[in-house]
Amino acid sequence: MPVIKVRDNEPFEVALRRFKRSCEKAGILSEVRRREFYEKPTTERKRAKASAVKRYTKKLARENARRNRLY
């Protein structure tokens, strides 16, 4: 859990914004959304594999775009 210290004469809104930003960097909200409902291990593996394939295709597309720009 991210902890922030409220500075002297710091408005509440600014402290809240800093706390939200630290939570976002720590990945707490995405973790909570991921754990909200039970996910079967097969579904979890399927989702992980699909994201790996998506990353790979994006990487290939970037490399192809770079290669096409060079010539």
Curated annotation (Swiss-Prot):
GO terms, molecular function: structural constituent of ribosome
Annotated InterPro entries: Ribosomal_bS21, Ribosomal_bS21_CS, Ribosomal_bS21_sf
Domain of life: Bacteria
Entry keyword annotation includes Cytoplasm: no
UniProt cross-references to Pfam families, sorted A to Z: Ribosomal_S21
Metal-binding found in the keyword field: no
Alphabetical GO biological process terms: translation
Keywords: Ribonucleoprotein, Ribosomal protein
GO cellular component, one term: ribosome
Membership in a protein family: Belongs to the bacterial ribosomal protein bS21 family.
Designated name of the protein: Small ribosomal subunit protein bS21
Organism: Baumannia cicadellinicola subsp. Homalodisca coagulata
